[in-house]
UniProtKB/Swiss-Prot annotation:
GO terms for cellular component: small ribosomal subunit. NCBIfam families: rpsL_bact. One of its GO terms (molecular function) is tRNA binding. GO terms for biological process: translation. PROSITE patterns: RIBOSOMAL_S12 (PS00055). It comes from Mycobacterium szulgai. The modification 3-methylthioaspartic acid is found at residue 81. Pfam families: Ribosom_S12_S23. Belongs to the universal ribosomal protein uS12 family. It comes from the Bacteria. This is Small ribosomal subunit protein uS12.
Length: 88
C-alpha cells in the first residue's frame, strides 16, 4: 500500500550545512603524509567553522601564509590520498 521508502543519501560535506563555502578560523596548521603509493608533505589545517564544527582542510597551491587564528573560506572537495580530509 505504501511502497518502499527511498534511501536518504549521506551528505559528504556535512560541516558546510548546505552552504557552498563556510568561513572559519585556523586552529592548527601542519603537514601530513599521504596514503600508500604516494609520498609528499601535504599542507593541511584544522579549521573551526562558523557552524561550530572543527574540520581538517587541505591548503591548495605551492605556498601559503596561513597561521593559527587566520580567517579562511572552506569549500567542499576531498583529497583522495589524505584520509579524513574532505574540505579545501
Amino acid at each position: 500500500r505504501k511502497g518502499r521508502r527511498d534511501k536518504i543519501g549521506k551528505v559528504k560535506t556535512a560541516a558546510l550545512k548546505g552552504s557552498p563555502q563556510r568561513r572559519g578560523v585556523c586552529t592548527r596548521v601542519y603537514t601530513t603524509t599521504p596514503k600508500k603509493p604516494n609520498s609528499a608533505l601535504r599542507k593541511v589545517a584544522r579549521v573551526k567553522l562558523t557552524s561550530q564544527v572543527e574540520v581538517t582542510a587541505y591548503i591548495p597551491g605551492e605556498a601559503h601564509n596561513l597561521q593559527e587564528h587566520s580567517m579562511v573560506l572552506v569549500r567542499g572537495g576531498r583529497v583522495k590520498d589524505l584520509p579524513g580530509v574532505r574540505y579545501k
